[in-house]
Design a protein with these regions (language model features):
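Conserved, mostly hydrophobic/aromatic
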Residues: 6, 26, 114
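Histidine-centered catalytic micro-motifs
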Residues: 2-12, 36-41
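Gly/lys/ser-thr-rich phosphate-binding loops in alpha/beta enzymes
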Residues: 7, 12-14, 22, 85-87, ...
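Hydrophobic residues within beta-strands of alpha/beta enzymes
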Residues: 34-36, 114
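Active-site mouth loops of central-metabolism enzymes
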Residues: 5-19, 92-96, 124-125
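Short, acidic/polar
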Residues: 15-25, 97-105
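Extended substrate/RNA-proximal surfaces in nucleic-acid metabolism proteins
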Residues: 44-125
Length: 125
């Protein structure tokens, strides 16, 4: 089975394509299992004003709202393309101390998988 479990869309700061575009490209390339796993720091754009609200303030609410919006969008596409390609919903987490910190309570269990980046770097947390 041909598969790709590391792809990014416009939800990531390093991707520019719509999710539909990369799914269509995967189908055209013969991929049968396709994972979309955008960077959590891209899905959730950091706004400096959130810092003043603390981790349990409005910024935390935005984390939840944006992650659920991303999850729901990919979920709709999973249904749309069922029978043509199997789509997994992932999220990519950064372990570097200077990255946008994740709230301690953050629940990502509803994703199919998570990729952890920079885990081999000395300064990784």
């Amino acid at each position: 089975m041909l598969q790709d479990l590391h792809s990014h869309t416009y939800y990531s700061y390093c991707g520019g394509d719509r999710p539909e575009e990369i799914i269509e490209a995967a189908i055209a390339g013969g991929i049968e299992l396709f994972g979309i796993n955008d960077h959590v720091n891209g899905v959730i754009t950091h706004v400096p004003e959130w810092d003043a609200l603390g981790k349990d303030g409005w910024g935390s609410w935005v984390y939840d709202r944006m992650l659920h919006r991303y999850h729901d969008h990919i979920g709709l596409l999973r249904e749309k393309y069922a029978g043509r390609i199997k789509i997994l919903q992932g999220i990519e987490l950064c372990t570097l101390p200077y990255a946008l910190p994740l709230p301690e309570y953050l629940d990502i269990s509803y994703f199919d998988y998570a990729l952890i980046e920079h885990i081999d770097m000395k300064e990784s947390i």
